[in-house]
Amino acid sequence: MVDNYEKFEISDTSRVKSKVFLDKIISAHKAATLVPNGALVGFGGFVGAGAPIVVPMAIADMAEKLHAMGKEFKIKALTGASTDPNLDGVLARSDALSLRSPFITDKDARNAINSNKIAYIDTHLSSLAKQVEAGFFGEMDFAIVEVAGITEDGKLIPSTSTGNAQSWLNIAKKVILEVNTNQPLELLNLHDIATLGLAPNAKALNITKVGDRIGTPYMSADPAKVVGVVVVATPDRVNTFTPLDEISMAIGDNVIKFLQNEISAKRLVKNSLLPLQSGVGNIPNAVLASLKTAGYKGLNFYTEVIQDGLLELIKEGIVETASSASLYLSDKGMQEFRQNIDFYAQHVVLRPQELSNNPEVIRRLGVIAMNGMLEADIYGNVNSTNVMGTQMMNGIGGSGDFARNGYISIFLTPSTAKGGAISSIVPFVSHVDHTEHDTMVIVSEYGYADLRGKSPRERAKEMIKIAHPDYREALQDYFDRACSQEKAGHTPHILSEALSWHDKFNKTGTMKKD
């Protein structure tokens, strides 16, 4: 049963200044009826920020009613990254999705994907828009995009993220705009909107500093393609943070130790380092907290998501500029941002994800990439997506964009999961997202393994050191026996045992030896 989405619709049309678009205002219900069964739909938004939710709720409600009448209705949904529970979650619960890409965090969508009810395509965030533009997914029928307002001359004021919104507006045959009057119009001052085009005519990106701008503050849509404008007042999905625990703080401190060592070795500039990227969640927040007390000044971030911790670093002058794809803040963080939006506009740039995650820019700027993971093996291969090799967690997201192209690629993990029943360091990962060729540093609460310039056997010795003490002896035993084989080779493995830890967990609920 879909919640009452009509409560979010409002009659105030003052945010729609253009007469052309004013004449296109319709209800969310009417907008939903325009979307046919089987449509490929591109939704705006990135990590919950700036995602339309009222029209998706209306689509889900329509789907439930059609299903009750014995009629088929499902759409194929492409986004920027994860979205709001009132987009991913409600569509999944209403059995209104046949396909989803490129990234999810909603538990209902995850369950439907892992039970094979929704086909899921796990894609690098920088790549999806280009793949759709090239026709790999077929024609895009609809773009459904949240904006903060529409100017008199028809320009679209972006919301708290753009994700792939501008690409969808360009590509889709038809467009529905959700004008969210809860979003501040001053967001206009933060955005840098540009698209790259396809080879052989793709544009070079002239971004040589984090704060460089190459586009316009507005998005645009061909008025002839816009079939509906829905005016709403909805809150952004807010980030809920749990207090930082000892393990997260230890990981953050170990990252700082690594960075300090790089400064001592003259591989990084003292105080300002190189541009940083960090993922979402408690461990990245712990890294931000550690940066706060480490004495750095003039830091820059070229990243995907701005969280509360990064906002604090900007306010305190530790971070000079942050380029991102979205603002994903708590209630308190959003209040701080809105009250001081003119200040933050001087330090924050919001870009489409084909810019924020662009490999060309990441490599040129020398970004230090910091991302979470599910597990790594003793040789440095990393699994970021599939629990026990089969169950999708969220997706690769932007970790591949940054890990392969960053100056330094760092992966962060607690040494165990499930109360110690799972070791995050295993003989061989059950799924590979980032190969040993792309991983440089792995950090746990027990230290960091610097894998740069090391052979597989040398890497294994470093990885075992940062594993949980409960698992180190077993890892060392596996490695020693693998090395003692007659044909141990370049990367020693015992193939009959390589995935035995995962098999044991599936059968007994623990990886620990009996």
State where each predicted segment sits.
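Conserved alpha/beta enzyme-core scaffold
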Residues: 2-514
